[in-house]
């Protein structure tokens, strides 16, 4: 049997295999706690993310299952990669990934970024998005704190817990407000990969200016700030609004003209402003795509069409509309973990991974 070691981090029990030592807290999110650790097998530093009570509700179980499936499927230099996963005796799930020293949020709050860093970071964000979108996945929650960076300026997008299928019908209220695309606020239901391009544009603007472009205090204020810079949405965009209340609100706003971004970003290169103009477009159908943005003149120092891969196959979203009980999600999760480790479910190693009662669940639903 695997040996598990317990440690208290921020009042939370971290229960991990003895393979990982030197636990240090890195960050706390709504759904998990992240610690740095040393992998005794490889000698490399890693990040260990504890998913809090993943089997407490069907919604949380499904969210965890979705993130696990995505991390297994998405394999790209600019996407965080999964190196290990296990279930502890207390039935918590732990994702182990590579450790990067900082994130873009911390960098932006510490100092202004020089042009070559802005270019290189934006290039890597868009390179990652091109791959993710080609897999049929929308990140939905792209923001500086979800963009990890190491000392070599290598960048990786993380936190796919909110990611969804490319689907004309989607639920609203997902991404952090400052980076949220207007179609999420306006229609709530219908959006696609373009929401990530909007978020990337907001991040690009923040790298140029050193502060958030649209720091809304609430949903209404957020939309108002956007219209102050980009003008009133075109009529054909307004017509796509599903909610009567939202439609009334938008029509009640004073008509505003789009302001030239060059006036706001006076110190930015014309090429940078041009790319930003193409990313921050109200109509998602007219917003530049990741592949097109990579070929923009502003990113020419890094653009290499032979080294900007797309996914070999689409992500399988067949589970996503399933309304299943916790125990069923648990069995599915266990199966995915065994598949990750290439373990036959009948052997002893399989029993090790079933420490937290998953074995009992499988017996119940066999």
UniProtKB/Swiss-Prot annotation:
Q: What does its activity-regulation comment describe?
A: Activated by tyrosine and threonine phosphorylation. Deactivated by protein phosphatase 2C homolog 2 ptcB.
For the modification Phosphothreonine, which residues carry it? 171
List the catalytic residues. 141 (proton acceptor)
Q: Where does ATP bind?
A: 26-34, 49
What does the UniProt entry report for the null mutant? Renders conidia sensitive to heat stress and oxidative stress as when mpkC is also deleted. Leads to delayed growth at high concentration of NaCl or sorbitol. Leads to reduced mpkA phosphorylation, and the double mpkC and sakA deletion completely abolishes mpkA phosphorylation. Affects the cell surface and the extracellular matrix during biofilm formation and reduced the adherence.
Cofactor names from the entry are: Mg(2+)
Q: Has the keyword Chloroplast been applied to this entry?
A: no
SMART domains per the record? S_TKc
Catalytic activity, reaction form:
L-seryl-[protein] + ATP = O-phospho-L-seryl-[protein] + ADP + H(+); L-threonyl-[protein] + ATP = O-phospho-L-threonyl-[protein] + ADP + H(+)
Q: Which GO terms describe its cellular component?
A: cytoplasm; nucleus
Question: What are the entry keywords?
Answer: ATP-binding, Cytoplasm, Kinase, Nucleotide-binding, Nucleus, Phosphoprotein, Serine/threonine-protein kinase, Transferase, Virulence
Q: Where is the Protein kinase domain?
A: 20-299
Subcellular locations according to the entry = Cytoplasm; Nucleus
- Residues the record lists as Phosphotyrosine modifications: 173
Give this protein's Gene Ontology molecular function annotations.
ATP binding; MAP kinase activity; protein serine kinase activity; protein serine/threonine kinase activity
Q: Where is this motif: TXY?
A: 171-173
InterPro entries, alphabetized = Kinase-like_dom_sf, MAP_kinase, MAP_kinase_CS, MAPK_p38-like, MAPK_Sty1/Hog1, Prot_kinase_dom, Protein_kinase_ATP_BS, Ser/Thr_kinase_AS
The EC number on file is 2.7.11.24
Protein family membership: Belongs to the protein kinase superfamily. Ser/Thr protein kinase family. MAP kinase subfamily. HOG1 sub-subfamily.
Output this protein's name: Mitogen-activated protein kinase sakA
């Amino acid at each position: 049997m695997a040996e598990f070691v317990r440690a208290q981090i921020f009042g939370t029990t971290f229960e991990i295999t003895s393979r990982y030592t030197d636990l240090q807290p890195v960050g706390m999110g709504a759904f998990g706690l992240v610690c740095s650790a040393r992998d005794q097998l490889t000698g490399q530093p890693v990040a260990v993310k504890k998913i809090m009570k993943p089997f407490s509700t069907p919604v949380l179980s499904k969210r965890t299952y979705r993130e696990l499936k995505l991390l297994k499927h998405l394999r790209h230099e600019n996407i965080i990669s999964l190196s290990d996963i296990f279930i502890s005796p207390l039935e918590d799930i732990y994702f182990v990934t590579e450790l990067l020293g900082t994130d873009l949020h911390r960098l932006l709050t510490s100092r202004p970024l020089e042009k070559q860093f802005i270019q290189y970071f934006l290039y890597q964000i868009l390179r990652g998005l091109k791959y993710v979108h080609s897999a049929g996945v929308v990140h939905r929650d792209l923001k500086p704190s979800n963009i990890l960076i190491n000392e070599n300026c290598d960048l990786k997008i993380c936190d796919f817990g909110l990611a969804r299928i490319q689907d004309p019908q989607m639920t609203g209220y997902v991404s952090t407000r400052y980076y949220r695309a207007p179609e999420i606020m306006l229609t709530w239901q219908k959006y696609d990969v373009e929401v990530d391009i909007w978020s990337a544009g907001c991040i690009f603007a923040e790298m140029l200016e050193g502060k958030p472009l649209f720091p809304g205090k609430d949903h209404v204020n957020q939309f108002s700030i956007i219209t102050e810079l980009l003008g009133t949405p075109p009529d054909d965009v307004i017509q796509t609004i599903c909610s009567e209340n939202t439609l009334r609100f938008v029509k009640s706003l004073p008509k505003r003209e789009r302001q030239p971004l060059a006036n706001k970003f006076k110190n930015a290169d014309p090429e940078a402003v041009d790319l930003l103009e193409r990313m921050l477009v109200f109509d998602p159908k007219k917003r530049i795509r990741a592949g097109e943005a990579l070929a923009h003149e502003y990113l020419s120092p890094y653009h290499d069409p032979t080294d900007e891969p797309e996914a070999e196959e689409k992500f399988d979203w067949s589970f996503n509309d399933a309304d299943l009980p916790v125990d069923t999600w648990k069995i599915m999760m266990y199966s995915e973990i065994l598949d990750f480790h290439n373990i036959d479910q009948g052997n002893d190693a399989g029993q090790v991974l079933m420490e937290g009662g998953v074995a009992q669940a499988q017996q119940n639903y066999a």
